Amino acid sequence: MKTSVLLVILGIAAITVQCTASESVEQDSLRTFVDAVLGWNAEMASEARCGGWMAKCADSDDCCEAFHCTRFNVCGK
């Protein structure tokens, strides 16, 4: 009787650990996907602000590199 109760408890513990581990993997992959989408949206918004890849920014001392306005000397110009 004691052995069967112990086996049931160990079985429940094993199932709980397995379910918890699979939930964390699913959450990590979902978080990675959401971060990728949000990062892409931020890059597109930044590109619109500086006029596109390697475009000139409003300040003549800046240029657009990697979707961000930076100083010309940083851009190699």
UniProtKB/Swiss-Prot annotation:
Residue ranges the record assigns to the propeptide: 22-49
An annotated GO cellular component: extracellular region
Record GO terms (molecular function): ion channel regulator activity; toxin activity
Major place of residence: secreted
Disulphide bridges, residue numbers: C50-C64, C57-C69, C63-C75
Tree of life domain: Eukaryota
Intracellular or extracellular location(s): Secreted
Signal peptide: 1-21
Tissue: Expressed by the venom gland.
Record keywords: Disulfide bond, Ion channel impairing toxin, Knottin, Secreted, Signal, Toxin
Entry comment, domain topic: The presence of a 'disulfide through disulfide knot' structurally defines this protein as a knottin.
Physiological role: Probable ion channel inhibitor.
Family stated for the protein in its record: Belongs to the neurotoxin 10 (Hwtx-1) family. 65 (Jztx-21) subfamily.
Protein name per its UniProtKB record: U14-theraphotoxin-Cg1b
Organism: Chilobrachys guangxiensis (Chinese earth tiger tarantula)
